[in-house]
Amino acid sequence: MESLQNHFLIAMPSLHDTFFERSVIYICEHDAKGAMGLVINKPLGIEVNSLLEQMDLPAEQVSTDLAFNANVMMGGPVSQDRGFVLHTSQPYWANSTDLGCGLMLTTSRDVLTAIGSNRSPEKFLVALGYAGWSKDQLEQELADNSWLTIPATNALLFDIKHEDRWPQASRALGFDAWQVSAQAGHA
């Protein structure tokens, strides 16, 4: 299967998993060993500025950017105590991975300090936890019609409100996801 890195997984309406129902997941990595992604539309109930305050991070300049007050996302059920910042490409921080397509994933505290200062990435999304799949697990879920895929866009990642991301992603498919059957191969 071709890599789905830099794609979105869109939960099928028939997926009734309590965590992944109506989820949109940005796939950060996908190779023969498995896949890793971040749920981008499930808020944790805490804003980024509150998270910075809880971590006692100094803020040289409080950003007026909408993202500064954006919700921290529940990135997935794995390692929910671990933070991830998905952001537009900027100078590297301590633990940054270039994902291509002008995006980076950073897991170090220094990017959070930068978010509270004038060195913030232009656009960013903060998440706690991630979604992970072992070898061939995601491929099986795709074969089971749990997910639809589309290429990722920065607009959906950063410019659309979290509650509008699943409907927007579904519309980007070019059809109404609610009218797609979860059953494959039956007429």
UniProtKB/Swiss-Prot annotation:
Belongs to the UPF0301 (AlgH) family. One of its GO terms (cellular component) is cytosol. InterPro entries: AlgH-like. This is UPF0301 protein Sbal195_3177. Pfam families: DUF179. It comes from the Bacteria.
